[in-house]
Amino acid sequence: MLTMDKCKHIGQLRLAQDHSILNPQKWHCVDCNTTESIWACLSCSHVACGRYIEEHALKHFQESSHPVALEVNEMYVFCYLCDDYVLNDNATGDLKLLRSMLSAIKSQNYQCTTRSGRVLRSMGTSDDTYYLHDGTQSLLQNEDQMYTALWHRRRILMSKIFRTWFEQSPTGRKRQEEQFQEKIAKREVKKRRQELEYQVKAELETIHPRKSLRLQGLAQSTTVEIVPVQVPLQTPASPAKDKVVSTSEDVRLKKASDSSGKRRPIVTPGVTGLRNLGNTCYMNSVLQVLSHLLIFRQCFLKLDLNQWLAVTASDKTRSPYKHPSITDTVYQMNECQETDTGSAPSRHPSLSLGLSGGASKSRKMELIQPREPSSQYISLCHELHTLFQVMWSGKWALVSPFAMLHSVWRLIPAFRGYAQQDAQEFLCELLDKIQHELETTGTRLPALIPTSQRKLIKQVLNVVNNIFHGQLLSQVTCLACDNKSNTIEPFWDLSLEFPERYQCNGKDIASQPCRVTEMLAKFTETEALEGKIYVCDHCNSKRRRFSSKSVVLTEAQKQLMICHLPQVLRLHLKRFRWSGRNNREKIGVHVGFEEILNMEPYCCRESLKSLRPECFIYDLSAVVMHHGKGFGSGHYTAYCYNSEGGFWVHCNDSKLSMCTMDEVCKAQAYILFYTQRVTENGHSKLLPPELLSGSQHPNEEADTSSNEILS
């Protein structure tokens, strides 16, 4: 990389103290939303992608003539007028100060000083929730609401346009006629019901009083229960109005009228974007995938650890700190017509009346976050429960996952800050923490936890343990005596190496095809161990235990085969390799994969005998994709199959769009998720009957037949 020691345009730079680059939530291109190669203009607040992505930063220079820009992640400075990277700073040392501030924001370490004592506006913050304060949260909550409202308005306008066009067509006119006839039928049913009620009331009034006062009192109390609306009988105007509708027709129309009153979801459940809070695309992609795995989502929609967590924590620690109630950490709906603006929001014991739980016709959506909770009160299971409730409520087009990010920072310190992270590492750490939390749940004051709750926790733990859990058969064969030694090893994902032809630098590597089946075959192929290094039990069996003779070492070969298939198969493609001592580069070749994967060729013989052929078939459920060329930079998106709408969705942080299977198969996959079509016990549903029967949709009253999606 060529650099200039001195650039005259840097000397003319005057950087504002409240530059937008200090907000991690703006570390993405304003045009294409990518977080790869992000350049911030140092003359204004514009942030865009570099010339090797979509050239939006270059276009901004051509339109505004602002020459100097800074790469947010690598912190290089580039001058477009000089067309070169620069090293010098201006007289006030703004670039050095800006780099120090960016490093502090990424690491969340604000113990930094400058020689002159001059600091930027945000330099004095010392809390690790730097950009999670109330002002920022409130601003983003309003933006989320406005985004959802704007999307909803656009959908309504588009629906009106298509409805007008549809009404002019022959099919539309026929539909209008049917609806008109249905209205008349409903009106006749209502009128007939009112007439019957009036007749019943008239008959009750003409009945003679009973001799027994007790029976007379009972009769009076019985008549009070029926309070019909008195409507004067009208003479039928035509024979058609005299027609009596049958009872079955009454029931059918009554059901139709009841169902028509149900609220349709604003968006298709699950089609909710997650705002990028500052290089958090790795977290957003993983959360989108986990929420679209049916068995995983249903478990955490059912389980909420917040209720007993506060009880056990307060009883165990006796801390003066009061754990925030569930309404302090979940998405709620507050009354929109509330006249007293200074009054506190109403408290609800559960999510049934909140954003995630039900349908409130006159409520305003609001996101409330925990305030500086201690780490022992934080529950990742509760945060997943809350977030999944919101994402699958059908009410939000965009959500800012503040609480989830805050919990990750506290419970997984390696991901604290706004630095770019690896999605595979985050997924492993997140699942490990969730499993540990569920395992330790029942041991903390079990007497205070209801039996039903402990049973539910045990069921969810069983699902979490088994959903990704499989077993490998490691078989070592001695080449001297042909003795085989078998070892069973657990696995939660399969890390697949690329073939040898992709491990070296070459110009024609990307043009050579590669498929995931080839990588699976490489994973399960027989591998020769180098030299005589294997201690064979059979070859050393004749040697006495305390004999002075040396141990016999032989040559051997090793093979890995799958002996127990997981319910959800995770395939991690090892795209990053070491190049030199401290550099990791990416293997950017496209890996072909299919919608249906047959795992039978990669299983051991015992599994082939014990399982039915249907158990080896897997369906593609999700794909995590990495955009970029390096390990420490890039952008993550995810392709997820939405079971509610029956379509594939491309999840790019806040932007979600419908896509086809062909588009999914063209993705540069990093992690593949396949769901077993039929489990070993022969069931197609992976969810336990106890959880499946008791689970509820987060928006029970929503009509999920609507297939509208974000455009």
From Swiss-Prot:
Its EC number is 3.4.19.12. Gene3D superfamilies: Cysteine proteinases (3.90.70.10), Zinc/RING finger domain, C3HC4 (zinc finger) (3.30.40.10). One of its GO terms (molecular function) is zinc ion binding. It is found in: Nucleus; Cytoplasm. It is an enzyme of class 3 (hydrolase). Zn(2+) 1 binds at residues 7, 9, 79, 82. GO terms for cellular component: cytoplasm; nucleus. This is Ubiquitin carboxyl-terminal hydrolase 44. The lineage of its organism: Eukaryota, Metazoa, Chordata, Craniata, Vertebrata.
